[in-house]
């Protein structure tokens, strides 16, 4: 919700309120993540004992997690600060900050884990400290930029200021969080269906899921960069440009995902053999790669439409879309396909579900744009 709210305010040239909302957002993240970190710190023993950790292993878990929970605040705040930067139109700096954090972590890890010269090796505790330091550098960098660019107020807000400005973030953020929580549930249900076809099918499905995260990386990048562009134009009441940005992103993702599908199709044999020597698993990985990625473009349409709805402050529409895609189309289509045509039917069902939902998503957003344009005309 941070990017959508601040983008709209900046688009309407309401910089004063944009600064207040940005500050309220960072304070909210600080409070929520701080609370979760305290709870996590207190419950290290019971949680990991439930997970089967031995007393010897608990010592190492304490060394790592006690520092990780403290450092979690240093991760959450830069992520939120990066959303503010993206909302202002800067998409490069957030990438640089995250990349720098990764580089610092990679440099400090061997130094603090194994030691060097006067620096004594700390083992797994050193790994946690290296991660926390890398996140801390990112936090300092983000805060300096936000203050320097006048995108936040360099003080804590008064209680009344905080409550007034945080409401809009929760209005969009809570439904968006709910939509994100539904995806692993649906994937878990489909994984259970896949399990009926044996261990080889589960292994192939797992490999497919990892390949999907790589194949859809451009889609995920667009889902983060499109909302600020739409929000700013929405705030400036330039609805025609909102639709142009949305439609351009849709055409691009369909084309790029078609190219990615073609590449995966051509190299499916090679990739399958890289992952496994088992012939049965390899054949199912090939089956996955020659069917499921065909629907990634349609999936991208749904994902970008969800982002666009959030950007124009229609979070419930995005939640409804995600619910429909997962539980009215994806899970039922996969289940019916598996009954009628086995594992191939399940894969085809996933593609059909994404395709049908993509068409519905596009038509719904186009209708919403028409409503906004009519409202704009009537006001003028």
Report residues per predicted region.
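Alpha-helical transmembrane segments of multi-pass membrane proteins
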Residues: 55-81, 219, 279-302
